[in-house]
Structures are given as structure tokens and as C-alpha cells.
């Protein structure tokens, strides 16, 4: 924050412990809640959470529970991505489970449709492919004004100057 950063994004994915173990992303809700609250206290002006549907061992109930928990924290923006299963890539990330552990296309579609419905009910606005924002967020305002931009990371309210990825 002291270096001028004002936006922060957390790669939540899902809060189900079995799903988290399968994707090697252990981060209990209480931890995400704490760092989200700290970011708000420090003064970050835009907080985003990334959620993923179609993860191994994930079902519709998991997706909806994750959305409920995430919405209780009121991040300004949400990305709601579809999981891409590419087990041939090096590393252990997608080799800790079997192909049949990944939800089938019909279930993924249901997770997206029901998840989107819940996000809209909870006050988020659909910006475009897999992005949602609250009304007060600059990305939503840019969407409304017709000045939204897109880069390889998703939508943005301004042209990308510098992007730094950590982790």
C-alpha cells in the first residue's frame, strides 16, 4: 500500500477443503476474511476475489456456498472463472486427482448459471465474460460509460500501464 498500490485481488477458487487440497490451494475462509478486512482497513480502494467453478470434487452446493461466503465479505469485484483441466502441464497442480473427479460439462454449466444468478441477487452486476462488480466499483462505472478495457487478466477500467503478478 505504501508503494501506491490501491487494488488487491485474492485467488480464492473455492472454500471446500477437499477441493482446496486437490488443487493445492489451502486457504480457509477465516484467513481470506481476515486479509480482506485488513485490506479495507489499510485503505485499498478495490478488492477482488477470483472464484472458479468446475474444480475437481466440486459440486453446485460448493460453488453456491463459496459465493455466499465471498459475498459476505463484499469484495468490489469478482471473477468467476471456468476451471481448465490441462494435466499434461508440468508440475503436480493437476495430477493429484483423476479425470473423473472433475465435474462434467453439464454440471459445470449448472454451476455457472446458478452461480451467476446468485451473484446478481447479491448485488453484483455482470460486466462481461466471467467478471462481476458492485455499482460503486470503477470497473462497473466504466462498463456503464462504455469505456471498459480488456487485457489478458480480464476487464479493467483503464488501459493497463504496469501489471505485477506475485505468487
Q: Model segments located where?
A:
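Conserved non-cysteine loop/helix-boundary elements of the Radical SAM core domain that shape
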Residues: 1-122
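A C-terminal junction/extension of Radical SAM enzymes
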Residues: 91-167
